[in-house]
Amino acid sequence: CRVVVLDACFNGSFHLDDCIADEYIFGQGHTIACIANTVNVLQDKWADRYVGLLGLGMYVGNVARFSGYLESHCIGDPTFAFTPAVKMEEVNDLLASNDPVKWQKYIGENTPSDLRSMAMEKLWQQGRLSSAQLLRIFRTSKSALVRLQALVLLAEARDDNFIEAMKLGVDDS
């Protein structure tokens, strides 16, 4: 296995003598990188939020970068990437961009869910996506991942659209 994600406390504690992530990296296998936690971590977090972007060729280190959790680290080679499953522009260049015109291309329903979720995040952070648009996405998207992303972003808005999404979310499966 090339990449291992360990989502538990202390399994990436590189500062200690015994670290589970080190066993994968320095063991006899072929592991190139581990995403692991150094200390106690929140148990109700979305640790694998953008992990699907690995299938589009995202660097493994970006999983930790975009997780938003200080205790999550990439141990090993953060520049390792799998061959992209689909042809598209270079995803790591795209992730480095804050150009709303580029990101707007990936907001549609036919975009892979993880990439669409990242586009939503980027556009929301730039003020280019309104809570009304997020509610529309929440109502219409066939992807549970995209609906969850819309709900998380709506929670930041804390407005009537978030309240409506919460009501709708009760029956979301």
Task: Set out the residue ranges of the language-model regions.
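Active-site proximal loops enriched in glycine and acidic residues that flank catalytic Cys/His/Asp
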Residues: 7-10, 36-39, 67, 78, ...
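Long, helix-rich interaction regions
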Residues: 111-115, 139-149, 157-173
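A short acidic, amphipathic alpha-helical/loop segment
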Residues: 19-24, 133-137, 165
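Catalytic cores of nucleophile-dependent amide-cleaving enzymes
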Residues: 1-49, 53
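Caspase-like cysteine protease fold
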Residues: 47-129, 136, 145-149
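Conserved positions within tetratricopeptide repeat
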Residues: 64, 132, 163-167
